[in-house]
Amino acid sequence: MPPATGDIDRQIEQLMECKALSETEVKMLCEHAKTILVEEYNVQPVKCPVTVCGDIHGQFYDLIELFRIGGSSPDTNYLFMGDYVDRGYYSVETVSLLVALKVRYRDRLTILRGNHESRQITQVYGFYDECLRKYGNANVWKHFTDLFDYLPLTALIESQVFCLHGGLSPSLDTLDNIRSLDRIQEVPHEGPMCDLLWSDPDDRCGWGISPRGAGYTFGQDIATQFNHTNGLSLISRAHQLVMEGFNWCQEKNVVTVFSAPNYCYRCGNMAAILEIGENMDQNFLQFDPAPRQVEPETTRKTPDYFL
């Protein structure tokens, strides 16, 4: 049964103060979110106006700053292009808040899957350890990583702007190819679903081997052809740190949006979000990090053994 509106509103209020939910609340939240996300599409249609956001990576106070700059949810419609967890100190609170907002305002918020929304990656880059530290077990990690399998892979704003975390795939020429994928699974090591979450644009033409070890690099010729074939004006993606928070490339066929300022608390970059207005007009809002909070104790407590 869906949670009462009052319950979810109370949870959102609590999360806005960076106070984590109980394990039971997370379990119920994820179960409800699954019932919403399972009905969404691999290419989820989105109407304008909408504000498009890139990586957040557990930088909770910078997410609050994003909402301050861009407008609160649900007053502003948002589309997040993945990578909510890992690296920052507050992955639990960050992903909990975004999922709670999705459950409360399902038509006002679109949350896509990033390459970090995966069991394997989160065990290496911090989310798993954070869940153990904050809850004393891995149950919350399991609830969220099971939910991640349901996240849409891409979104399409007014049939014109194609949004996704990473980039294109040599296996996928059309949006219909993407629509036919079975997405409800762990991110594979290779293949089209992996490519959408891992690939990057590149200055060289054609397809290239990615230095990331997953996905591909794709040239301007590839992006131009993909946009032409599918009647698109723009590919909007995240996945790469860009110092100004946004970066046009490939003759403005592709834009990278990155929304974690001073990434990893040391990169010195600005963050940005992309406002797409009623008439599909585009406006970038840049922002600096929120004032530093007291960092939590992040020493890794290694359990005596792993079950």
UniProtKB/Swiss-Prot annotation:
The keyword Phosphoprotein applies. Binds 2 manganese ions per subunit. It holds the Pfam family Metallophos. Reversibly methyl esterified on Leu-307 by leucine carboxyl methyltransferase 1 (LCMT1) and pectin methylesterase 1 (PME1). Carboxyl methylation influences the affinity of the catalytic subunit for the different regulatory subunits, thereby modulating the PP2A holoenzyme's substrate specificity, enzyme activity and cellular localization. InterPro entries: Calcineurin-like_PHP_ApaH, Metallo-depent_PP-like, PPA2-like, Ser/Thr-sp_prot-phosphatase. The keyword Secreted does not apply. Keywords: Cytoplasm, Hydrolase, Manganese, Metal-binding, Methylation, Peroxisome, Phosphoprotein, Protein phosphatase, Stress response, Ubl conjugation. It is found in: Cytoplasm, Cytosol; Peroxisome. Disruption phenotype: No visible phenotype under normal growth conditions, but mutant plants are hypersensitive to salt stress. PP2A consists of a common heterodimeric core enzyme, composed of a 36 kDa catalytic subunit (subunit C) and a 65 kDa constant regulatory subunit (subunit A), that associates with a variety of regulatory subunits such as subunits B (the R2/B/PR55/B55, R3/B''/PR72/PR130/PR59 and R5/B'/B56 families). Also interacts with CHIP and TAF12B. Interacts with B'THETA. Interacts with CLC-A, CLC-B, CLC-C and CLC-G. This is Serine/threonine-protein phosphatase PP2A-5 catalytic subunit. It comes from Arabidopsis thaliana. The lineage of its organism: Eukaryota, Viridiplantae, Streptophyta, Embryophyta, Tracheophyta.
